[in-house]
């Protein structure tokens, strides 16, 4: 669902409607400083999950813990992904046409409430390990569900966690309640960053050609559903979920109560991010001190996203960013391998 709500006019994270491509209300004209702050903040936030998610993906690929094992995307998976995404998008479109938008978004809010708590807890876990006081006991727990008895007993759930994980879960739950009750843009971004980082960390491409297939297929998917139909725009306007990063362009004027947002869909972060993470793992596999492929593709993404923001601001159409953010990463990565 990362690409469903990308770069289109959507209701902002605080619940106020926005009716321009960059999330600006019709009569509001942002100041140059506010616009620069919003776009610069989105660019910075986009880089965080890619950089740290890629670093964590290296450790994830070496982990022997079953719960930390990454999901490997094959060429077949990449080819099918645009088809599955299209079916999901059209299914949501039909749901919003048939059923009440209020009830659908209520179900989606609860769904992303649970997912967001788990994603944010997983994101916070390494940091909690570093700041957790050494003099406090770190007790171990195990959540075990089995089916049957005796020799026919079968494990359904076997999850081990400790005190640090419970603290992370508690903090994440507070953010989750904040998001569900207020739909505040900061809570939205905390969940969005957690989703993006987990995606880059846990979704692994098996080779460069798979990444090219995935990026190319999703480019065609975006072009068709945005320019060919009104399906994506309709779903995006109706869909309320933390699947985008937002930043207010009127922050300097209204502070934290700002309501006119620029936005960046998580698909523009996660999809290029898993490709960049693949190149970092390739660098590591070469057993050299340099990270040439990773830094080259990372800089290409920065250049592509920066150019996209310029084009979007100039021509008032954000969808063109697919050409730069994904095409730039493919070209820099494939040229060097």
Give residue spans per PLM region:
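A membrane-topology feature that recognizes alpha-helical transmembrane segments
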Residues: 2-337
């Amino acid at each position: 669902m990362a690409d469903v709500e990308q770069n289109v006019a959507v209701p902002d994270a605080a619940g106020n409607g926005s009716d321009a491509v960059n999330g600006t209300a019709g009569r509001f004209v942002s100041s140059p400083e506010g616009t620069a702050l919003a776009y610069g903040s989105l660019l910075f936030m986009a880089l965080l999950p890619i950089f740290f998610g890629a670093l964590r993906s290296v450790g994830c690929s070496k982990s022997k813990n079953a719960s930390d094992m990454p999901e490997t995307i094959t060429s077949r998976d990449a080819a099918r992904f645009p088809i599955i995404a299209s079916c999901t998008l059209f299914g949501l479109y039909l749901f919003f046409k048939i059923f009440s938008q209020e009830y659908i978004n209520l179900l989606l809010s609860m769904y992303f409430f649970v997912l967001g708590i788990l994603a944010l807890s997983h994101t916070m876990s390494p940091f909690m390990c570093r700041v957790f006081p050494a003099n406090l006991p770190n007790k171990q727990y195990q959540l075990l569900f089995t089916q049957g008895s005796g020799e026919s007993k079968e494990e359904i759930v076997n999850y081990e966690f400790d005190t640090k994980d419970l603290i992370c879960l508690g903090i994440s739950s507070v953010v989750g309640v904040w998001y569900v009750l207020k739909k505040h843009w900061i809570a939205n971004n905390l969940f969005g960053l957690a989703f993006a980082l987990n995606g880059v960390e846990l979704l692994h491409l098996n080779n460069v050609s798979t990444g090219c297939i995935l990026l190319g297929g999703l480019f065609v998917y975006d072009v068709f559903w945005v320019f060919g139909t009104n399906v994506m725009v309709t779903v995006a306007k109706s869909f309320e979920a933390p699947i985008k990063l937002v930043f207010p362009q009127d922050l300097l004027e209204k502070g934290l109560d700002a309501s006119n947002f620029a936005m960046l869909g998580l698909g523009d972060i996660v999809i290029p991010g898993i490709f960049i993470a693949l190149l970092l793992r390739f660098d590591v596999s070469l057993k050299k001190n340099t990270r040439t492929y990773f830094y080259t593709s990372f800089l290409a993404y920065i250049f592509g996203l920066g150019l996209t923001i310029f084009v979007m601001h100039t021509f008032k159409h954000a969808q063109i960013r697919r050409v730069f953010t994904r095409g730039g990463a493919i070209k820099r990565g494939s040229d060097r391998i």
